[in-house]
Amino acid sequence: DIKDGSLCIEGKNCYTLYYNMMLFFANGGSTCYIVSVGSYEDALNKNAMLTGLEKLTLEQEITLVVIPEAVNLNSNEELRDIQQQMLSHCGDRMKNRFALLDIYPKADENTNIEDQVTIFCTNIGSNFLSYGAAYFPWLNTSVVGDRDLTGDVFVWTDNIYANRNKLSDID
């Protein structure tokens, strides 16, 4: 049930970094480095994410490596490749940082937690595991308050850039 004056977002939002950052700072996070790997006009891309990971070698102060939108890539294999590279980056190349990893979302409602964990453990491999951790199950929460809701309906598409005019029209 949608109340008057609320914003209803339907569909999957692949671009979650803004909300991830809101939660990071709301829970005591401070200094944070963000590497841009594209725009809303671009689809999420494994190679762009890996290029962004490579750029982190230029900054020595980084202690925690997180790529939260990697779980929104097209396949479990793409997520696996990124996470293996994150562990290698932290444990082999830099040796001074830690990777926070996510477990790929359920394929469907019949997928059980044990299967998700088994797939993750099989895919992640055995290299540099002391340089990373996976937190599971996911914590689903909202970072949008009632005062942020306007009554408009917005439907996510594969490319949010196509909806940029709808977003700019919302007061």
What are these regions (language model features)?
Residues 1-171:
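Surface-exposed assembly/interface segments
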